[in-house]
Amino acid sequence: MSHATGAAGASGPIETRLPTGVKDFLPVKAAKLEYLQATLRQVFARWGFRPVIPASLEDLSVLELGLGSDLREKTFRFDDRQSGRLVAFPPDITPQVARIAATRLHDLPLPYRLCYSGRVLRHAEQRLGKEREFWQAGVELIGLESPEADAEMIAMTVEGLLAVGAREFTIDIGQVAFLRGILEGLPLPAAAARELRAAIATKDGTSLQRLLDDHPVPDRQREEVLALPRLFGGIEALDRAATVVDNDVSKRALDNLHRVLQVL
């Protein structure tokens, strides 16, 4: 049996505490985690998804192309001594898979069915005691835009959750185009637009009202924005949304969601 010993001349015990927000996984929990990952990989494979393992580091400028403002602020970044560029530990694997699909898979036919799993790091408010290291597993279906494709992803998600033992869960279904249609053309400076998106993400109606009061937003667009925090729930939420939005982009997004639910 080997024993670790301290360096000659050491004056005290070595500090072995981990940084805040990260953890080791000892054998029992590590085995559970391995089981969950293996089970999900089997589900992904049955649906035709192939694994990719993205790089541990990314150029910050490339990574930020696929990150929202919230994740940009949570990204661990530092100077690369070799290149002199800013690099980062990805806080989300999704933008990395998008980069791989856009730059490395030209010799493969569309659609791409790609799956992944791994650790990601994110800055967190220390006073809140939040984790900074997460396990993320997921899939990306690229190059096939249809209600049937969306329904396929939802059905596979349900199968994956059941396979790992989940029995009570809720799946939130949304459409980025619906929000884009509401926000397009809003007469807001860049800083106010970012603040508005953050308030929408947290369903902060008070902040939305304040931002709209501070800028000359037309009444119809104001009504659409202020309705956003209330537009959640079952299929009835789509009916409520249809009475609120008055732009073609959002209307088409609602129509697509209706068709997805019909396929399911």
For each feature predicted by the language model, list its residue ranges:
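Short, conserved phosphate-binding/catalytic loop or strand-edge motifs used
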Residues: 131-137, 173-181
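Acidic, His- and aromatic-enriched active-site or binding-groove loops in soluble protein domains
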Residues: 73-82, 187-212, 217-218
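Short acidic, glycine/serine/threonine-rich loops at helix termini
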Residues: 63-65, 126-132, 181-186
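Positively charged, Gly/Ser-enriched RNA/tRNA-binding surfaces
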Residues: 2-9, 29-49, 58-59, 83-84, ...
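Generic N-terminal amphipathic, Lys/Arg-enriched alpha-helix
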Residues: 16-26, 241-243
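Polyanion/phosphate-binding surface patch
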Residues: 21, 55-87
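Residue-level "edge-of-site" marker
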Residues: 57, 174, 196
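Charged, compositionally biased N-terminal leader segments and the immediate start
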Residues: 1-17, 188, 195
